[in-house]
């Protein structure tokens, strides 16, 4: 039995050992798993805490870090890792204050650093950055290496810095493959930066010193949609003809506050929607400037020198919704009759502002759409036959300043003794509307020193050569004056002429390149200026002006006469009053005045009732005449205790005042209650 038990015991011992070993191994593995889980949880919590930690000087809200307007000189180093937008504007941060660990914040996409103390383009920026605001700093250079560190950048704002053309490194934007918006307003640029990225959609270069735009300035910018060049030094002579025609996708072009005398040639027409040309010196617009601009919605020509517009200028503008024409010297003659009809026809769809007439005189200040009878005269003149009759019936201002000379941009004056002019001794009649002529001109003297010239060309011409000669002067001495006028013009104003002089005015059609048309004879007309001092001229001007023209002068004369008469009446009244006052002064007697009883209390002086009782009228005055006046005072003695005399002469000190003195020199008030 013992042996059997021992054997059984020996048999079960290994199995129990194996079971215990398995249990211990399982327990060890569970402990390791728990420790690993705990370590992982601690690391996760640490990362979460670190990512949500906000700098003490800032405010954080779902990835938006607000550290602006804090007076910081450097960016806080403990920026959360989940930050997406950093507001750091209006501080004093310089380039040394941008920490290197900022580029490790891979979630940051927008940084606002405007109005700080940066003098170089920052380099420690995260590669994930897509929008950067650096306005109102002192950044002077743009290096390729700086932009290469932020290849995903889409919007770059560098307004109000010190960037110049030479400080932009060549191919600085070569690595900016996604840049769509570039603002360089109010810097020191003298030309368009080169090497701009092809992805650019909006470019602002306003308020710089750009004076020249070469042909290749916008080469490759096929995606550009908005271009702003306001406030520069641009003139027509320094802009290449096809500069803007390459920008086929452009929808907005702004050339405000420049020195343009006419809109630039070959503007993009396919997709242009907004065209801003205000605040220039534009005096004429070629008739085909706005051709094929069927998408144009807004056109601003305010604050220029426009007096007229060519017929058909707006024919292709089917989508035009707003037309601004303020502050121009519009001359509302027959040449603008088409514009009046166009404004009336498109009144429901086009908002026209500022089309106010500055001449002729009788329509000054009127909106062109409200003019009726004045322009209807143009129809009457045309129906009576002959362009000469039309010129006679057309109302023209008597002031030469009302019409700005046309073609001034191309004007040149030269002495050409060999110019083909007819003999000055022949009396040349006014040109008539003969159908055989290719050019008909009409002249009309306006004032003693100006003549208005209008013409009509039967065939299109690139330009006209206009010449004039004062009779009595030989062409050999160089008195012929000429100018080149654009082919789309129909009128010209000669000024600074001699009064009471006869002029021969000739015009000839020019070919391309400003050469004379073969076998083309000049068309001439003769006109005589009025006498600047002649009474006949004055009478004629008054008759032409109508019966109402003399009213302002009559009003001025009548007002002056009435004013002189009023001064005479007032002078007579003043003289009479002065004389009457002297007579009354001599007869009137003035007496000394005595104060009322209440005046003592009002003046703060106590009355000695124990001594005097004064009775008298209210107010008396001291006489001017030396004779003695009657005494009007009644003095009653009340026998004071000291028995001193109460009578005082006129020479006694204090006589006539509110405070009397006794003979001993002691005031009465000191004895009032003794």
Curated annotation (Swiss-Prot):
Interacts with FGFR1. Interacts (via extracellular domain) with ADGRL1/LPHN1 and ADGRL3 (via olfactomedin-like domain). Residues 574-674 are cytoplasmic. PROSITE patterns: FN3 (PS50853), LRR (PS51450). This is Leucine-rich repeat transmembrane protein FLRT1. Residues 52-552 are extracellular. Plays a role in fibroblast growth factor-mediated signaling cascades that lead to the activation of MAP kinases. Promotes neurite outgrowth via FGFR1-mediated activation of downstream MAP kinases. Promotes an increase both in neurite number and in neurite length. May play a role in cell-cell adhesion and cell guidance via its interaction with ADGRL1/LPHN1 and ADGRL3. Changing residue 671 to F: Decreases phosphorylation. Nearly abolishes phosphorylation. Detected in brain (at protein level). Pfam families: LRR_8, LRRCT, LRRNT. It comes from Mus musculus (Mouse). The modification Phosphotyrosine is found at residues 600, 633, 671. Keywords: Cell adhesion, Cell junction, Cell membrane, Cell projection, Cytoplasm, Cytoplasmic vesicle, Developmental protein, Disulfide bond, Endoplasmic reticulum, Glycoprotein, Leucine-rich repeat, Membrane, Phosphoprotein, Repeat, Secreted, Signal, Transmembrane, Transmembrane helix. The chain crosses the membrane at residues 553-573. The keyword Glycoprotein applies.
